[in-house]
C-alpha cells in the first residue's frame, strides 16, 4: 500500500520507552556525539531532548549514554553498546512490521499461522519447494530420527530424516508446526513408482522447459518443482511419479 506509515512504540514498566521521536534523537547523538547538536538536528529543544533521555534512562535495563570528558574537542556524548543494539533492534522491528502489513494484501497467506506468515515476509531461500505442515510422529531408525509431517493436500506424510540432536534442538513434538524445504534437483522423476520408496507421489507435468518441470498433484493442486536433464523424455500433461529422499529435506520451525 502506498503512503503507509506504521509507527512503532515500545513501553517498559507501562511507561513509554522508545518511539520514532526518541529513536531519531538517539541516532543524531550517534552521528554527532553532542546532545545539544542532536537536539537541533532532531528539531527539539535542548530541555525536551534531556527530558526524553532522562525518561528513557530511568526505565532502561542498561545505560544508554556514556559521557566523554576532556580531549581535543572537550569531550561529548556517545551511545552505549546497549543503545546501539536497541537502535538496530528498532530498525529490524520496523522492517518486520512493514513486511507483515504488506502480506495483508496476499489472501493466500494464512494469518492464523505465525510460522507461515513469518516465512512469507522474511525468509528468502534458494529452495523452490516449500511446504508447511505439522509433526505427526517421530521414530528412531538406524540412529536417525525420522519425522513424519502431515502436509495438507498430500495423501501421506512427508518423511524427514534428521539427527536426534536436531530433533531436540528444534524441540519437535506432535502437532508442532514446521516448514519443509527442498531444492528442485532433489525431486526425482520416474515413469513408474519405485518399490519401498517414501515421499513418493503421482503427479502430472504442468509445464516443462529445458531446465525444470512444474509437477502438480492432481487431487489438491499442490505443485513441485523438479530439475530435468532430458526434457525430451517428458511431455506436458504426462502422468509421472516423483520422490524425494528423506535426508534431502530441510526442516525448520520457530523456537
From Swiss-Prot:
GO terms for molecular function: cis-regulatory region sequence-specific DNA binding; DNA-binding transcription factor activity; molybdenum ion binding. Residues 124-191, 194-253 form the Mop domain. InterPro entries: Mo/tungstate-bd_C_term_dom, ModE, ModE-bd_N, Molybdate_resp_trans_reg, Mop_domain, Transp-assoc_OB_typ1, Tscrpt_reg_HTH_LysR, WH-like_DNA-bd_sf. Residues 1-121 are annotated as: I. It is found in: Cytoplasm. SUPFAM superfamilies: MOP-like, Winged helix' DNA-binding domain. Residues 125-133 are annotated as: Required for dimer formation and molybdate binding. The keyword Repressor applies. It holds the Pfam family HTH_1. It comes from the Bacteria. One of its GO terms (cellular component) is cytoplasm. The ModE-Mo complex acts as a repressor of the modABC operon, involved in the transport of molybdate. Upon binding molybdate, the conformation of the protein changes, promoting dimerization of ModE-Mo. The protein dimer is then competent to bind a DNA region, upstream of the modABC operon. Also acts as an enhancer of the expression of genes coding for molybdoenzymes, both directly and indirectly. NCBIfam families: ModE_repress, Mop. Homodimer. PANTHER family: DNA-BINDING TRANSCRIPTIONAL DUAL REGULATOR MODE (PTHR30432:SF1), TRANSCRIPTIONAL REGULATOR MODE (PTHR30432). Belongs to the ModE family. This is Transcriptional regulator ModE. The lineage of its organism: Bacteria, Pseudomonadati, Pseudomonadota, Gammaproteobacteria, Pasteurellales.
